[in-house]
Amino acid sequence: MTLTPEERDALKQQVVACLRDEPEVRRIVLFGSFLGSASPRDVDVAVFQESEEGYLSLALKYRRLLRPVANRIPVDVIPLRATGATGAFLHEIEQGEVVYVR
């Protein structure tokens, strides 16, 4: 799927609109092929959050909230702790685009 800059911006705004009202969400970062390709295969969304909920329940919750976006392009969502997140994969996420900060 080829996206125009306007379509890409609209999808970014839609991701934020779907997740910003969740009280635990602190930061949303988009990364991966969505940023670097004219024809991305999906949208990778890292949600930095402060919640005691487990990874699976948060991932399912965010996937449900992001269904309007997923109807246009596949979505991969990764909930991460706002503090203490570490690892090599985090470096790739940090190279992404921050689209929301609370």
What are these regions (language model features)?
Residues 1-29, 35-40, 49-102:
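Catalytic core of pol beta-like nucleotidyltransferases
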Residues 44-46:
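Short, well-ordered beta-strand segments
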